[in-house]
Amino acid sequence: MDKKLKVIVSGGGTGGHIFPAISIADAIKAAKPNSEILFVGAEGRMEMTRVPAAGYDIIGLPICGFDRKNPFKNIVVLFKLMRSQIKAKKIIRKFKPDVVVGVGGYASGPTLRMAGKLGI
C-alpha cells in the first residue's frame, strides 16, 4: 500500500485562486485516493466557505492586504503578517505535509515562507 500523501494547499481571496486550488486538490485525490489535503486560507475570505463546500478542510490565517489609502493602518497589517507566519508554522508542524502548494492570495506568502524554512 502506498504511503499516504499529505498536502497543504494555500491561497485564495478570489475565484481565480480558489477554484484552481480545488482542481489541484481534486486531481491529487483522483491520482492518490488515500491522500490527505488541508487548505490554508485567509480568515473571512471567500475560500473559507468555498473550500468546505468542495469537501476539504481549511484553516484560516489572520492575514490581510496593505491599505493603500491609509498607510498608518499598515502597522496592523505587519502584526497580522507576523501572527500568520507563526500560525502557519504551527499548522505545518502539526499536519506534517509532504508538499505545500501555493496558488496565490494573501495566505500563500506566510504558508510558503514557513514551509521553506521548515525544509518542505
List PLM regions with ranges.
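Short helix-capping segments at alpha-helix termini
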Residues: 29-34, 117-119
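Residue-level detector of alpha-helix initiation sites
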Residues: 13-15, 105-107
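Glycosyltransferases and closely related glycan-assembly transferases
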Residues: 89-100, 109-120
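Short amphipathic alpha-helix
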Residues: 17-28
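Conserved nucleotide-sugar phosphate-binding/catalytic loop shared by glycosyltransferases and other
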Residues: 4-14, 31-80, 85, 89
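Short alpha-helical
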Residues: 45-46, 106-109
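Redox-cofactor binding/interface segments in oxidoreductases and associated redox assembly factors
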Residues: 9, 101-102
